Amino acid sequence: MYSPDTTKYLIHLILQIEGVVDKPDVVGAIFGQTEGLLGEDLDLRDLQRTGRVGRIDVQITTKRGETKGVILISSSLDRAETALLASSLETIDRVGPCTAHVRVDRIEDIRVTKRRKIVERAKELLLEDFDEGSINSDDLLDEVREAIRIEKLEYLGEEKVHAGPNVIDSDAIIIVEGRADVINLLRYGIKNAVAVEGTNVPRIIIDLCSQKTATTLLDGDRGGELILRELLQVAEIDFVAYSPRGKSVEEMSRKEIVKALRNKVPAVGIIDQPPAEENVERLPPSAAPAEVRAPAGAGRTSEGERPPRREWDSKPPSTLGEHMADVRDKKIARFLSPDYTVLLESNATDVEGALQNLNGDVEGLVVDRIIDQKLLDQLGGRDIEFVAARDFKGIIKRPLSIRLIKIG
């Protein structure tokens, strides 16, 4: 029996018949008119019987009294024998009662076709599959380091909260929301983080806060706000830090984490807020070198004179805490850019007028005065991210986009 796996060549023949015939007529003519033509060794019936020639595939169509089509014959003979067999088929001149013309179109080398397909497929595999699976030494190192960091995780208390390896021995701890936050801090060498893992604060965290300096680093979303509110009620929190708006702690880069921790604010400024204003949010701090610049005509007093330009004793304030300390009890206001540069400094009583003269992005306001609902509404119209003020009175409706912090 012939096996397709042994095929070397495929003979393509073109057939034209002057009349109407069927496939069996064509097959019969092939066997009948080639019998004994090439001797016993190349007899078509014997070649099929021994599996050296495959089945004869006839494909014909009849139209207007004529029959046309192709004949395909697979062969495992060598090149010379296959060529001889193909040429013998061109001697067929009749099919049934009809005149026929048979011509060899081509002899296809199956192995060449297979090799071509193999090469094309190899190109596809090289471009597609190997692209994603390429070996990157940095990725391998990161994967190993990640596994080591996870191994360093500890479980504290009866609640088995996730914590870094230095939480017990360190004088200060950083309270985050979940396990992924602890791992991210470990990634950057911060080993004293502990996860609160929900609004139900574990007993071990309450105990740690009473013994150590506690700083919260929570997501700047509603969930982080609720967790902070719970922590402030049940634990002794010393400082509060926030992730950038719209970003969770587990997504923060090293620079963002360091900046947030460096700009932490005392928790007392949050704890002392009046109960009627519990919905006041806190500022998500950031930091950068400060540089004073003001638009022309901005920040003048009611008499039309510009307040004297401040000269700092050393370097300009670059963090929220420094700005808050600098304006405290001085009756001044500062509008800050996203990198905490001073855009404009004015009298605290002239915030409304200065606001009209500001151009560009204003990140926040630090002011030594009481903020009321009317002024807060005006600030909300400027897409200001935060307001730090001496106090907040009569706040009934706070713009959701503004976070408020009280200067202690």
From Swiss-Prot:
Signal peptide: none annotated. Mg(2+) 1 binds at E177, D219. It comes from the Archaea. Transmembrane segments: none annotated. Binds two Mg(2+) per subunit. GO terms for molecular function: DNA-directed RNA polymerase activity; metal ion binding; poly(A) binding. Its cofactor is Mg(2+). SMART domains: TOPRIM. Residues 171-250 form the Toprim domain. Residues 302-314 have a biased composition (Basic and acidic residues). It catalyses: ssDNA + n NTP = ssDNA/pppN(pN)n-1 hybrid + (n-1) diphosphate. GO terms for cellular component: cytoplasm; DNA-directed RNA polymerase complex; exosome (RNase complex); primosome complex. Keywords: DNA replication, DNA-directed RNA polymerase, Magnesium, Metal-binding, Nucleotidyltransferase, Primosome, Transcription, Transferase. Its EC number is 2.7.7.101. Residues 284-298 have a biased composition (Low complexity). One of its GO terms (biological process) is DNA replication, synthesis of primer. It holds the Pfam family Toprim_4. PROSITE patterns: TOPRIM. CDD domains: TOPRIM_primases. SUPFAM superfamilies: DNA primase core. PANTHER family: DNA PRIMASE (PTHR30313:SF2). RNA polymerase that catalyzes the synthesis of short RNA molecules used as primers for DNA polymerase during DNA replication. Belongs to the archaeal DnaG primase family. This is DNA primase DnaG. It comes from Methanoculleus marisnigri (strain ATCC 35101 / DSM 1498 / JR1). The gene is dnaG.
